[in-house]
Amino acid sequence: MKKAEGTIISAISGYYDVEIDNKVVRTRARGVFRDRKQKPLVGDRVVVQLDDQGMNYLIEILPRINEIGRPAVANVSRVLLVISAVEPDFSLELLDRYLTFFAWKNVGVVIYLSKSDITSSERLKDIQTELEYYQRIGYPVFEDAEKLENELPKMIDKDQIWTLAGQSGAGKSTLLNQLESEAKQVTGAISTALNRGKHTTRQVTLFKYGSGFIADTPGFSAIDLFKIKVDDLRNYFYDLKEASANCKFRGCQHIKEPGCEVKKLVEEGKIARSRYESYLKIRQEISDNRMPEYLKK
């Protein structure tokens, strides 16, 4: 029997739709996965045993890079992080929490500022100034949906999987629907084969976008940072990590240690004070195993 590698793009009631060479193949999982306590996830790269009679089986799950979200998506390369300018209000602290979480998961982030068109020009200018810092430390930032839609297909490499994240009400579903509508005009075959409805279930599917995929889910808004080791947190603030190479002590936690390059650059305005304050606040919460204030509301 022929074997082929592909990507799971949908999982419903024990059936797995796998994209192999731009075609969708419906499969079942062998019992061996249950015996190994392995569960195939949307996004998994898998080996499929193909049968001329249509009885196709998953026989191997290839090693995962990561898994994120609820329900989980495997092998996510990048996240499109939707941050609202207003309703809900823009929050640097929340932005830093998301960036920390995805750095921990080893996932790249592209920031999209939504609702900029209903924000006062004065407030928007302040937000744009704050986001310029994030661009300087390596995060792409978009605030124009049309420009994002033009650039996004070029940014998604072959077989990469992207998903969306952001707080509730930020506009993730609206953006996702726009992207999916555009994608269906280009690759209608796969979308039709899946026969998906609107976002009324907790199922996840992938739709083809550019050379890769976007997860068809409104994403997730809650993030859990408590599993990060407190002394490792500094490594997930990339600007702090870069500066720490010049700290006096190798294990500097950038709190009270003498000769701390991070604190020096904060005082000089070269590292955003808000970033440093986010680091200290998250570090204290992890240390105390304390729920952040924004989740108590």
From Swiss-Prot:
Stretches assigned to the CP-type G domain: 65-223
Single GO molecular function: metal ion binding
Cofactor list: Zn(2+)
Keywords: Cytoplasm, GTP-binding, Hydrolase, Metal-binding, Nucleotide-binding, Ribosome biogenesis, RNA-binding, rRNA-binding, Zinc
Signal sequence coordinates: none
Gene3D superfamilies: Nucleic acid-binding proteins, P-loop containing nucleotide triphosphate hydrolases, Probable gtpase engc, domain 3
Cofactor: binding details: Binds 1 zinc ion per subunit.
CDD domains for this protein: S1_YloQ_GTPase, YjeQ_EngC
Localization: Cytoplasm
SUPFAM superfamilies, alphabetized: Nucleic acid-binding proteins, P-loop containing nucleoside triphosphate hydrolases
Listed transmembrane segments: none
Role, per record: One of several proteins that assist in the late maturation steps of the functional core of the 30S ribosomal subunit. Helps release RbfA from mature subunits. May play a role in the assembly of ribosomal proteins into the subunit. Circularly permuted GTPase that catalyzes slow GTP hydrolysis, GTPase activity is stimulated by the 30S ribosomal subunit.
Family: Belongs to the TRAFAC class YlqF/YawG GTPase family. RsgA subfamily.
Name of protein: Small ribosomal subunit biogenesis GTPase RsgA
